[in-house]
Amino acid sequence: MAIRGRGGDRGGGGRGGGGRGRGGAGGFRGRGGSRGGGSRGGARGASRGRGRGSSRGGARGGFGPRSSKFNDARLADKDEEEDEEEDISEEESNVSEDEIEESEEEDEEEDAQSGQPYMSLLKSFQSATKTKKRKLDHPEEEGPNKVTKTKDDDNSDDEDNEKVTEDVDAVDEPEEDPQDAPLEDLFDEDDDLDDSDPFETHFTAPDEATFQARIKAIQANKWRTDRIAKNSNRIYYNTPETGDSAEQKLPHSISGVGDLKLKQRLAESMAKHTEFDEAEKAVAPLLFNYQDMLYCNRSVASSESIRRMACLHALNHVFKTRDRVIKNNTKLQRDDTLELRDQGFTRPKVLMILPTRQSCVKMVEMICKVAAPEQQENRKRFDDGYVDKSTKFSDDKPEDFRDLFAGNDDDMFRLGMKFTRKTIKYFSQFYNSDIIFASPLGLRMAIGSEEEKKKLDYDFLSSIELVIVDQADALLMQNWEHVEFIFEHLNLQPRDAHGCDFSRVRSWYLDDQAKYFRQTVIFSAFNTPELAELQRLYCHNWAGKARLQAEYPGVIQYLGVKTRQTFSRFDAASIAADPDARFAYFTKAIVPTLVKRAAKDAAGTLIFIPSYLDFVRVRNYFANNPAVESVTFGNISEYADTPEASRARSHFLTGRHRVLLYTERAHHFRRYAIKGVKRVIFYGLPDNPIFYREIAGGYLQKSEQALMLEHGQGHVKVMFSKYDIMKLERIVGTKRAGKMITEQGDTFDFV
């Protein structure tokens, strides 16, 4: 079944889409699509990762059948265009951006399969003994890490010219039988039994009356919310409503390593890092007490601290889990009548969802710093497939852009990691791994497609106890449906036994309650409706959950240029009616002004459009509606290749195109320094407040410096509705945003 792209607008839309194309699995693709499908795991250029060129900004297509080029009815006639294109300077027409490949694919919905009840599964395991043998000898076409070869069209003009590539992340390793696995040494000899350790109270020996009462409240969707102000942060703390009227308090503050219940080995490796910084102090109490967390204050400056805390917590959890299993193995060798429940259905316990291979490299490097392994198996293979030390960007690119896209920016990867006392093993088979690193697309492809001649394989997610989603704001610009698909398939009861010793499986696994014990931690630069909904739908931790976000001063005061900013509010009856209400307001209140200016000089008007679906609607309006026939325009979306974008920028600079339509995802992936901007119209506000500062401030400032615009004569017009409150508060500030949504007036000016 084909897997849809983002559909432009994250909320859906009937059409697939996404800006970043990639070879797909069984017809499903990443952001932008695969050429004709291809088999699972394969991808063009997989051995080096995608890098730039075919990666960022997206492949065109993915929206059903379409013409090869958009026919713009408002452009000058063809002959004039050809003459003028010859005069375009090489500097303007080649803006140092690699070409983005084209792809097309139809979209289909896919329903996630639900887990079967445990007892029926157990009966099926007992009646089908062959299933158990699958762990030892996988056929080549089965398993999430299988070696896969893909026939991927390498030339859009010659579909017969195909190249076979091997998946750099493929693993040709059998699934171990836990009962036949070699004996392992303890990670350290410290005593795990500490009744005050959150690992004990949450997983190993939780109070049954307490967690059962809380699970019952969660199933009835009864949550208690307490808003807590702490420093400059707002903390929304949610706990299951069990009838306790006392105010729920956050976990005790943690100021350093000494306040944590760490394995001795980790405490020694972190001995020099005694004091936590502000970011670490903010996340540590919830993180190490196994509560769900949506942290919305991640920045480039705090990214290292966030990774350190995430990796320390993940390693602490893995080491405690493995040591408990190893110690109990020894006990059972002495007395096999003991009942020791210390594990789940499968071995993987931690899942890290990351946007790029470079993000994975940074997380792995932090794990190595904290764990300090004596040996690293397959490290060279990891470096060859993930590390890219080439310099791709100049220093004038924004810091957050370089942090995300420097290095290997391939967004299709998956990696299993296994720990022993002395060794870290990279590229371990998923069922033999302790930690799984993956991008949403990479993990989606590992799970498989219903169109493939095999069943979906997501049993390796059945016993995940810790999910860490880092740089979630970047994942929003990929195919968010893949993230939702992954969460839908977490902690389902497995369909195969995988050699599991059910006598050692914890009771809450057998009772299908694993999702209530899983901790989910999401790190993002800001909050969005998608992230809030992800936490609402998939975070059911019986210990509670919290959202942390800052009080925003607003970026309008940091534009770096004096300009008039007008915010106009329009009414929408519901969030579903918002797109139509927005378009109606635009055509009635904004377009007439553009038409009047066209008679004089409307050149230099940039219209920023966050949603691709809205972009298509506005573009078609400018191309076909007689009301704007006097307004020439160009457009740059995430699907525009480099020559198209170069022509649009050049024509806009020279004034041939008086209006330029520009999408948020095009800016996210390319960060074009567009020249000639005199006025900016925000059809909608960007999620990322940095984009507002760069476009409303940076573009106008460049025009003033180039003497194309008189000082202070630039103008910014913003359209917003009450459903834009999250975006609005980051732009104008938390205090102003509330007033702008509720006040009777609908126009607000800032200078």
From Swiss-Prot:
Main location: nucleus
Biased composition (Acidic residues): 78-112, 154-195
Chain residue ranges for the region called Disordered: 1-195
Keywords: Nucleus, Ribonucleoprotein, Ribosome biogenesis, rRNA processing
Biased composition (Polar residues): 113-129
Record's compositionally biased regions (Basic and acidic residues): 137-153
Record protein name field: U3 small nucleolar RNA-associated protein 25
Chain's gene name: utp25
